[in-house]
Amino acid sequence: MANKVTLTATDGSTVEFYDEIKAQGGVKDVYFSVDKTYVVAFYRKAINANDKARINDIVNIHRNRIFTSDAVGQYWTAFFAWPTKIVEWKGLTGIVIPFYDKKFFFDGIDPSWPFIKNGQEKNGKWFSSAKLINKFVPVNQKGTFLSRLHMCLKIARAMRRLHAAGLAHSDLSYNNVLVDPLSGNACIIDCDGLVVPHKFPPEVVGTPGFIAPEVLATKALKVDNPKKNLPQISTDRHALAVLIYTFLLNRHPLDGGKVWDIDDPQKDDDMRYGSKALFIEHPTDKTNRVKADQLAKSQLPQGDPTKQPYTICGPYLKKLFDRAFIDGLHNPSVRPSAAEWEEALVKTCDLVQPCQNSGCEAQWYVFDNTTKPRCPFCGKEYTGQLPILNFYYAPSHGKFISENYRLMVYDLSLIHISEPTRPY
């Protein structure tokens, strides 16, 4: 039995945990509290005064501003695994983080399943690529297209709140979000590394595949070089767009068939995601189109954009994907904000309709504005009536202007219920 350790946090409260490492990250060792309501993560190496000051700001100043004691502040606690206390032990600094909600751990998996096991964290990576989700994730853990829309909505909403506080995550990726496609929930983790602009620079440049092209293009420059691009809110916006695209379509928007350097894989990756980054579904430049004949069976059909193009996500998301991966890929100032993604995802949720094929994995799809919509995932044509409400506003008496907002109404619609998909 491991020994119990009792410490006094910097805020004067008592922290108790067992002296046994339960998990290890890139820079921290994790211990479980005695009552298993929180974990204590200690930095493996002593941190400098600047890092201590940054963590103190995150734990105290920014936490108190976001997670206020009223209903609004409490609402946000489900969106972040935010550090709540700071402790010192054996010369090392540690942070106290609430234990992840049980919905972010796999449950209900058949013991004979050879890959994922019950109790494992639902790391976002499992649900990001066709190969992983098709080969390793059991059908009863995949969720539906609608629940994945809800999941992306939660991520966008969390990032909107973070950016509104003037903070940037700096390493937003599928590795730093926990997701639950079954309930449509998500939680941002690793919040101790947040960037406080103009005060605390980023610790890392990000995760490969999610690093903004302008950051990757100058990664070789020293930190004090004025030409070096560092993670900030605009680079978070790139990572958010990539994350939403991968969760909904199970492929990476920049992973096409073009090889930029045949001799050096690292240089090829740096060009693919950096200076030469090109959207695989670019409407006019076909240089980086996916070569379907080179895809593994486990990558299909999602890996082939000709089978499931990004337009199946509906008009609102299509417009933002264009801005993120065409207009804003190398022009950060025009990238969609987290608030814009949130709004587009809410509108898209209001435009979905149920698939009439009981065997369809997706179960839902976005109305395609035709009289005979067909599920893009299984091909089932919809039969029956399709009531669509178009919203207008009246700037003056007798004049009506479209709000660019439509609502699909069907017999199982829950529009009369206060849903968590609506902006708070």
Segments (PLM) and residue ranges:
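Single conserved hydrophobic/aromatic residue that forms the stacking wall/gate
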Residues: 415-424
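Conserved catalytic-loop aspartate of Hanks-type protein kinases
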Residues: 236
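Activation segment/activation loop of eukaryotic-type protein kinase catalytic domains
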Residues: 178-218
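Conserved C-lobe activation region of Hanks-type protein kinase-like domains
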Residues: 244-318
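ATP-binding glycine-rich phosphate-binding loop
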Residues: 2-51, 75-79, 88-89
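Conserved structural core of kinase catalytic domains
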Residues: 81-147
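Catalytic-loop of the protein kinase fold
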Residues: 159, 163-181
